[in-house]
């Protein structure tokens, strides 16, 4: 029996070492350790062994089985290693090869226009200040001398969150917050998103951007306002640009004006771009109303100031000759990659 076990073990180990595929290895496992395998048959014949020899023979059979199982597992792991190495070699990526470049975005016209405007005003000593887009009714209207019965407060024009909280319709509330801090003098601009209940078309959107400006100091006059906006227009549209102030009305400024610039396409001669007038409207402005100063805790007898507001999209549309505001929000790369 001992001799038979040794022969079976040596033959099995020899076949295991010579095997070159997993299928061959599995076949060896079945032939020697399966239900009808040679080693299993020896185990079944234990009934024919003398009782006193059974423990010894049983031990030898178990040792042979353990030896074969260990050899089979070791060979299986070797096959697995070879397969993994072959797979890794087949899937190897040459990192030195030139990669496909990802699609790059482009700077948005609004971003370019905002950075240009900020550069101009910061160069004149202005500070850039931001404020909340969700605002109290008081800061959006009453603190700006817009009474409770003013048409602008109508729900058809304003997005209300509650009866006294709304989406700001202008960035002017930022000016009020700054004035309430009482740190004078003030020289600031407040760029940001605003919201109005407008239908979407070529020139309107329910969400757009404004840049509001404010200067508060002693002895500020309308001449300071004119000089500031004239310089802004020249830096934005060119040194030959002229400005024209037309009387207007805003609740928070007195006197108030709308500002036109000479058409930078035709030099003021009249063309399709300026609709033949030679002038293009760009912003509204005026001297800060004394009541607005009072409500923010500033003495209008000692301090005066001016304010102005310009639509950021308006600047982008003019500078880049875009005829439809909706193009700014459609995220069409064919359009945006031009900038």
Swiss-Prot record:
Species lineage: Bacteria, Bacillati, Bacillota, Clostridia, Lachnospirales
Assembly and oligomerization: Tetramer of two alpha and two beta subunits.
Annotated keywords: Aminoacyl-tRNA synthetase, ATP-binding, Cytoplasm, Ligase, Magnesium, Metal-binding, Nucleotide-binding, Protein biosynthesis
Protein's name in the database: Phenylalanine--tRNA ligase alpha subunit
GO biological processes: phenylalanyl-tRNA aminoacylation
Compartments where located: Cytoplasm
An example Gene Ontology CC term for this record: cytoplasm
GO molecular function, one term: phenylalanine-tRNA ligase activity
Gene3D superfamilies: Bira Bifunctional Protein, Domain 2 (3.30.930.10)
Catalytic activity line of the entry: tRNA(Phe) + L-phenylalanine + ATP = L-phenylalanyl-tRNA(Phe) + AMP + diphosphate + H(+)
